[in-house]
């Protein structure tokens, strides 16, 4: 029995939900998201409460039950409150600036790195901190991971791009000979 799948998802008043066959449609005043279930789960929407039931008794259907429950819950949270990730840029000469539809990063390469900001993502830059906001949890995490991958933090001095809550395990440098 899936503990995540059997949870009932409360839909706030700021989000409208509707079921069309095997599709779930969510929208608020700005955006809309769609979740296709491919008839792997049975969808029930009553009184702004959304629930799922597995179609069969097979283990695969029970796995989809929890997966679609989590995906629908993430869409509801994203449309009502949104998701955000914060990145920190540490290092001498490492700079971040917000251009027109691009994020300009100076990370010690011979050239500046220009990252195009995808649709549905909003970025805020303060000093050397990048805040990535959006309604799609997967897209926010993907953008943060792509920016971090340009210069991941190194273990000796901690220079690079890291998540704000990430702990970098430091290594000792070379020791002098006696």
Curated annotation (Swiss-Prot):
Coiled-coil stretches noted in the UniProt entry, renumbered to this chain: none
Gene Ontology cellular component list: cytosolic large ribosomal subunit
GO MF assignments: rRNA binding; structural constituent of ribosome
Alphabetical list of Pfam families matching this protein: Ribosomal_L6 (PF00347)
Keywords carried by this UniProt record: Ribonucleoprotein, Ribosomal protein, RNA-binding, rRNA-binding
GO aspect biological process, one term: cytoplasmic translation
Keyword Ribonucleoprotein: yes
Family: Belongs to the universal ribosomal protein uL6 family.
Subunit structure: Part of the 50S ribosomal subunit.
Matches recorded under NCBIfam families: L6_bact
Function: This protein binds to the 23S rRNA, and is important in its secondary structure. It is located near the subunit interface in the base of the L7/L12 stalk, and near the tRNA binding site of the peptidyltransferase center.
The name this protein goes by in its record: Large ribosomal subunit protein uL6
